[in-house]
Amino acid sequence: MYEIHVVTTIAAPPQKVFDAISDHEHFLGRPGMICHLVKEGVQNKNGRGAVREVATQGRIFTEEITAFDPPRHFEYVVRRMVDRHGKSARFLHDRGWLDFAPSGPATRVDWHSRFEIPIPILGWFLERVLGKRAATGFRQLLEQAKSELEGQTTSGNTEP
């Protein structure tokens, strides 16, 4: 089982950071990536029970939100991964989760994801390749969110 762990600190309060990152369609709707909500969550559109499809780099991930505790934590699991032709990939996702914790006036975000590729002999190698790519993608997403949120915080505090 391969685990990704990416960390960043965003100069904004936890609720604001949580709201931005748990807004799946906006947070995951970036250049080279498309996300749409297939099913709304139980108590919150983006909350527990929500199902999203994320298309990126020739793959489509169907993910379900399995835990939702604003503004501290949410979890998801990839239920299915297919290529652009609809062929299922051999990919087992244990879970992914994001934790949001106050860090002074900012928020620390920890993003974890655990998965395996059950292919004899090559699986361990493919896990590392995919894991490094995914970690880079997670970092980029968090950096974009950081830039947007810190820009809002700065522009929101500017007096005329």
What residue spans do the PLM features occupy?
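Short structured motifs
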Residues: 3-4, 38, 48-50, 61-62, ...
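Soluble or luminal CAZymes and related metallo-dependent hydrolases
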Residues: 57, 92, 133, 137
